[in-house]
Amino acid sequence: MLKCIPLWRCNRHVESVDKRHCSLQAVPEEIYRYSRSLEELLLDANQLRELPKPFFRLLNLRKLGLSDNEIQRLPPEVANFMQLVELDVSRNDIPEIPESIKFCKALEIADFSGNPLSRLPDGFTQLRSLAHLALNDVSLQALPGDVGNLANLVTLELRENLLKSLPASLSFLVKLEQLDLGGNDLEVLPDTLGALPNLRELWLDRNQLSALPPELGNLRRLVCLDVSENRLEELPAELGGLVLLTDLLLSQNLLRRLPDGIGQLKQLSILKVDQNRLCEVTEAIGDCENLSELILTENLLMALPRSLGKLTKLTNLNVDRNHLEALPPEIGGCVALSVLSLRDNRLAVLPPELAHTTELHVLDVAGNRLQSLPFALTHLNLKALWLAENQAQPMLRFQTEDDARTGEKVLTCYLLPQQPPPSLEDAGQQGSLSETWSDAPPSRVSVIQFLEAPIGDEDAEEAAAEKRGLQRRATPHPSELKVMKRSIEGRRSEACPCQPDSGSPLPAEEEKRLSAESGLSEDSRPSASTVSEAEPEGPSAEAQGGSQQEATTAGGEEDAEEDYQEPTVHFAEDALLPGDDREIEEGQPEAPWTLPGGRQRLIRKDTPHYKKHFKISKLPQPEAVVALLQGMQPDGEGPVAPGGWHNGPHAPWAPRAQKEEEEEEEGSPQEEEEEEEEENRAEEEEASTEEEDKEGAVVSAPSVKGVSFDQANNLLIEPARIEEEELTLTILRQTGGLGISIAGGKGSTPYKGDDEGIFISRVSEEGPAARAGVRVGDKLLEVNGVALQGAEHHEAVEALRGAGTAVQMRVWRERMVEPENAVTITPLRPEDDYSPRERRGGGLRLPLLPPESPGPLRQRHVACLARSERGLGFSIAGGKGSTPYRAGDAGIFVSRIAEGGAAHRAGTLQVGDRVLSINGVDVTEARHDHAVSLLTAASPTIALLLEREAGGPLPPSPLPHSSPPTAAVATTSITTATPGVPGLPSLAPSLLAAALEGPYPVEEIRLPRAGGPLGLSIVGGSDHSSHPFGVQEPGVFISKVLPRGLAARSGLRVGDRILAVNGQDVRDATHQEAVSALLRPCLELSLLVRRDPAPPGLRELCIQKAPGERLGISIRGGARGHAGNPRDPTDEGIFISKVSPTGAAGRDGRLRVGLRLLEVNQQSLLGLTHGEAVQLLRSVGDTLTVLVCDGFEASTDAALEVSPGVIANPFAAGIGHRNSLESISSIDRELSPEGPGKEKELPGQTLHWGPEATEAAGRGLQPLKLDYRALAAVPSAGSVQRVPSGAAGGKMAESPCSPSGQQPPSPPSPDELPANVKQAYRAFAAVPTSHPPEDAPAQPPTPGPAASPEQLSFRERQKYFELEVRVPQAEGPPKRVSLVGADDLRKMQEEEARKLQQKRAQMLREAAEAGAEARLALDGETLGEEEQEDEQPPWASPSPTSRQSPASPPPLGGGAPVRTAKAERRHQERLRVQSPEPPAPERALSPAELRALEAEKRALWRAARMKSLEQDALRAQMVLSRSQEGRGTRGPLERLAEAPSPAPTPSPTPVEDLGPQTSTSPGRLPLSGKKFDYRAFAALPSSRPVYDIQSPDFAEELRSLEPSPSPGPQEEDGEVALVLLGRPSPGAVGPEDVALCSSRRPVRPGRRGLGPVPS
């Protein structure tokens, strides 16, 4: 956006003006100045009332925004905007659109929403370019009948109008994608609506539709359909035709069922059918495999379909306010479910399979009839569990109990069983409640009525339905409550409870009383109970019924007293009826006893007020403390029975033996507990009574205050006391600071309690403060004489910063002092002899065994947790001043571990662990809030010392705060994995079994973490390959161990499999999880490792490089690239793909092709990409220490490769080949590709040339500078078509210098090269060549041991510049890329043949005259020799004894050389005729090798023909130049001939005096200091067409080119030709050569050699 500011001499060329939200009341005048250039004008959100005349002179406007103004009229001059594309006049007061709008022919986007329009002008439909039209909320009553003329409409918005019908022409809008008709009065849709082929969104909400046309199913591209808030009673079956539908909104209709065709909507993601009348959901819903959100709220569903379990992508299921009675067990199949809402249904039980929905975070079951929750829900990571509407917190604390009906373990809490709110069906029961209260004492009104007239018995239910149960009861007086309570207790002893669903109907009076008492529905199941054998049998059901009637019809005050109870929280709906023969204490939590006649409900009392009853500070005698700590309840009903569970501040309940319970009942003075004024007397009586009941339980109770009782061990322990000491510490500051953090200060958040002092909140482990003895929690009193008591935080910071180098600080430290008195051991009762917290799992399965002795063995563990953004991820319970976690134990315990939190990920904590110290602060006898403050301190890491009951001996782990471990000595606890050894660490059962049953020994290694590195690296994980370790059994392995690191000193080795880290199972962990487990801060790292055998062939080799010597290897593979192992595509290792015999590796002889590289100079190669491995290998010095192991066998695995390799052409390779080109690299920075027969190389593998310049390896050759900037301009030839293979591969040649003596695979033959090599040829034709010395004897070509790239001709180097050879296509001719049409080619051939005949005689005459001079320019080899050498590759005959390669057989009987596919076929036919039995090949070649041979052979054919063309061109040009200039003049060609430039020869001739290492390659001469610059070469002008570089057959047909009529271009051609071919040897050409040359075809003047074509 451009804000135009009218400055002086401002630029008048303004295209956009934005004046939105500027409170303009008129169009600014400066806008008119830009009428010639203004294209975009935005005046939205102003106060414009009219548009003046000059406004419509802005003829170039393309976008006009006038929304949110007060414009009352749109003038007809709007037709002036003939270039207007976008018009927005929404939210104005425009009453009509002018007819002249039709002249805005360019209008594409128009928005008229929010105007008081009632109709559209007749010419509006002439806006044929209109694509987006918005007419929302314009009071439109009908659409124009010809609206179909707007054929380009893509979006049509007609929301909030008065439309009652749609025109039939709407179906002509074939481009329409979005149609919004919501908020209209449509009653029926036209059938033609289904003829919109491109419609994607259809909005029909808030209309009056009663049915949808079946033609709607033809909208195959429809994505969103909204028909909510209509009157639909059914959906058409054709709805299943909407195959792309993702959103289907059917809310607020009258649907009773969904069609079965809905299962065809495979893409459906959101289905909303809330507020309908659904009685069932079709089973076909399970076929909607992509459904993620299903809303079925407020329907009449009784059950859900079983196919719901197929919806594996379902995340949100809402079935609130239905009539569900049960959930199908298949709901556990919804593994992605995260929110399940079942509020206000009739559910009595939840299926345990619900625990399979592992992603479930929110479960809402409020308003149901649940008795309990399945215990399996503890496996879920629930964030919210709603059991009631008025629930205060999203998560509750649960107890476990056994279901009396099924015997299964269930969860319960104070909100279970549920008490659903009264509904219409309960109104009849609640209506007559006033009858029960009508006989209240006359002095008080029991029920406050809201109706004037009294209600009779006959219409009580009807009146109650009208009132909806709205009554208010009078609050009883406390004195009345006491009388009522006694009456209720007396009546309970007269009758046994009756189960409502036992078969006998309850009397009406009893139903009313039950509803008044509990408000629970009649079909809820009772909670779990425990059977008491000694309980007397109750009466039968009939007797129960009679007693109930008697009890409920008793009149007067007794009824009123009975109906009122002290506020209780009910756990079941079975009310305790009068007639129970047991007296129920008020404060005693009752275990649900099962009687023969019915079930006793569990009553849970309200939590007492914190001021009532037992207070330790007000106890009159110390014996009461002993009794209290021994297990007394706050209400004093008796000790906690073993097996009871605490629920926060609430009292536990547990089944007890009948005798014990009777004893407690006899001596419990319950009546006195209600009165506050009798509190002290009640406490004394309670304590004395309990002492009498527990005779023999406590032998001697010490009369000392503050004793504690350990019920687990039955010990009376004198508590430790906290002493405070003042210390003076001196810290020597270092460059990194003091290594402490402080918290608190006056005016800041207190660090501990209400103390506003300065505290140490964090101490670095290796910092100066830690070495001086500073601890977390120390209170800072003084720093270098500056008092900090009462100081603010910033003052303390400044004091520490300005303290200088030596900091002397005075701190105040709290420490626990153990008592001197011995522990008093009390005899155990038999029923108390087991751990009361065994079943407190909370969803984590702990391998805890019941102790065999009264005092179980305890094991201490160290856990170090790093605080995450969500905290530490665990909760603690217990401590002084809090409810004990274990009865009689004031210690602090881990009570809950949040799944996915820091503690859960660490795996070192377990529920039930006792916390002994936090960050070195002893908390064994600390208060709960003190421990919380230590855990919530600002320290990022928390070190915990834990104590855990274990069955085995204690491991030798030192305490972290006693003596810090040194880094030099590693504590290692080794346990051999033999069955029956008790010394294995405490592990999960599955991990323990794996450690015991494995074939290899398992050891536990402990590494003290002193702040330094561990000295090891790992590889593998469930998401990473671990090659070469664990190929058959993946896992996490140690891939590197530093020689003198902590891991090496502890005995860890490369190849060890890590099973667990600090108790956390990492066998199936991802790589990142394993790394996080190892890096997690802790005081000691415990590793459980398995000694897996080392990879086969693991050894370390040391190779010394001579000064300037190359390493001489190439590598392949690497992470995130092409696999280097042909046997395993997932193997990301680094392998040796080539070993050059001239390098240090070849001289050493121990490295071979196929070995896997693990480390180079102590640097691991595991997990490195190909490029990183190359850089690492290139950076080594003269000494190479490499760790290798066996990889693959080059000879056997070569045939497994699908692709024969990568022929890297850095110029023609596209983005798609980047990975493959980077997967093979030479390690030597200056290494060039060498002769294919001179290296040990994997077949089909070639080197990828980097941008480095090549260097000559032979003696006498100067390095050549290769400038690829000019070559990179050569256009790519596109895809490569492979030529079908026609010949078998040759025999493998024996390398004379192979150190291992093995036969390397044969190199690629010419058949392997791609068919269109002109790009690589053109790019490489300019490489200068060298010629061997003239005195070199001619001998059959035998490849030397090594040759540098400069010693090779361009034919031999072509394969390094080819594209990747791909799989051949099926049985088709090779694709030919022709740059010249067939007609033009035929004409050129005819023309050149005619000119050739005319010039032949003249050239024969001139050839003899130019013979002497031509000898100076051409080499001395005859054309026949050239052809014979051209037809055979340099490596085709490696030795005189080896047979010729069948790729290029010699001509028979002096026939023509084989240079084309046709010639080869003819030659093979002759061979078959002469020798009917074909020779059997010595080795069957793989298809890859055959393709390589075929491609390379054809490339050599083409190169030979190209070379002969060049020589012909040179000779012909020289002859023509001589003939035209005459003898007396020296032409430019003769002058150029004197310049030193090599001439090509087709095959190599080894030179004896240069040695085998430096034999020159074919056709090259030493260049004395001559560097070839391709930039100068690419700048040479060229007009020669490129049709001479074609596919083989086409190049064979191209025979002659037209001669030159003028000498100028010939001279220029001569220059280029000599630059290309080099300087010829003097006297190298005889007259016979000239005659042979003249018999061939001349060259056209425009031809300039075969160098790269300048772009």
UniProtKB/Swiss-Prot annotation:
Topology with respect to the bilayer: Peripheral membrane protein
Domain PDZ: 728-815, 862-950, 1004-1093, 1100-1194
Residues bearing the modification Phosphothreonine: T378, T475, T689, T826, T1342, T1545
Consequence when changing C4S: Loss of palmitoylation. Loss of palmitoylation, localization to cell-cell junctions and function in epithelial cell polarization and signaling pathways regulation
Bilayer-crossing regions: none
Compositional bias ranges of the Low complexity kind: 537-555, 1409-1421
Effect of P305L: Decreased palmitoylation. Loss of localization at the plasma membrane. Loss of targeting to cell-cell junctions. Alters interaction with TJP2. Loss of pro-apoptotic function
Subcellular location: Cell membrane; Cell junction; Cell junction, Adherens junction; Cell projection, Lamellipodium
One biological process term in Gene Ontology: positive regulation of type II interferon production
Biased composition range(s): Acidic residues: 556-565, 660-694, 1422-1432
Phosphoserine PTM sites in chain numbering: 37, 504, 688, 708, 764, 835, 853, 875, 939, 1140, 1220, 1223, 1226, 1232, 1276, 1279, 1295, 1298, 1306, 1309, 1348, 1378, 1437, 1445, 1448, 1475, 1486, 1508, 1541, 1547, 1561, 1591
Region (Disordered): 417-440, 459-606, 628-702, 827-853, 1227-1246, 1277-1489, 1520-1568, 1622-1655
Coiled-coil regions listed in the entry: 458-474, 656-701, 1379-1419
Major site of localization recorded for this protein: membrane
Keyword Chaperone (UniProt): no
Basic and acidic residues composition bias: residue spans: 479-494, 829-841, 1227-1242, 1353-1365, 1383-1395, 1461-1472, 1524-1537
Family: Belongs to the LAP (LRR and PDZ) protein family.
Protein's name in the database: Protein scribble homolog
High-level lineage: Eukaryota, Metazoa, Chordata, Craniata, Vertebrata
Gene it is expressed from: SCRIB
